[in-house]
Design a protein with these regions (language model features):
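Short, helix-capping/interhelical loops that line the mouth of catalytic, cofactor-
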Residues: 1-6, 52-102, 146
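Hydrophobic residues in alpha-helical segments
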Residues: 22, 61-62, 107-108
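Short, contiguous alpha-helical
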Residues: 27-75, 112-146
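Alpha-helical transition-metal enzyme core signature, strongest for iron centers
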Residues: 11-18, 40-55, 81-89, 93-103, ...
Length: 146
């Protein structure tokens, strides 16, 4: 039986959107405030962190089986913001693109059984539909640049 992986098409579309956006961002754009102390670069670094966390968890789940991975989201986001203070804005933007690509490729390589196991958990620590998170923040960035 084939499982529904239609989310991968949406992941690809939002990933392409991210790549195009990052390619046209200027250094002043990356420093533009989005409110709540976040800049465009901070939002992109935030995406990179959550994508790389998903990759680490997929690797773990493939070795050990799918399980919970509780996290204090506010503390994680505050930590990402603090890390951004020491990272060049352009590097954060480029990391976001690489992390999205890594997450998408990792998801595409997951065996169907693991995809089903992750999607079946009500407490899944991340979504395979990465496009949802990307879209939310790319929309914020594009609004902030207007």
């Amino acid at each position: 039986m084939t499982i529904d992986r239609s989310f991968q098409t949406k992941n690809a579309a939002e990933r392409a959107r991210m790549q195009a956006l990052v390619a046209r961002l200027t250094d002043p754009d990356l420093q533009r405030s989005l409110g709540h102390r976040w800049t465009v670069a901070d939002a992109l670094l935030h995406l990179a962190f959550w994508d790389l966390r998903a990759v680490v968890l997929m690797d773990r789940f493939e070795r050990e089986g799918v399980g919970a991975s509780p996290m204090d989201v506010e503390t994680a986001n505050d930590t990402v913001w603090a890390m951004g203070r020491g990272l060049p804005a352009r590097a954060a933007a480029e990391l976001a693109v690489r992390a999205a690509e890594t997450a998408a490729r990792r998801i595409e390589a997951l065996p169907d059984q693991l995809v089903e196991a992750i999607r079946a958990r009500p407490d899944a620590p991340f979504t395979l539909a990465r496009h949802e998170h990307w879209r939310e923040h790319l929309d914020d960035i594009e609004r902030g640049l207007r």
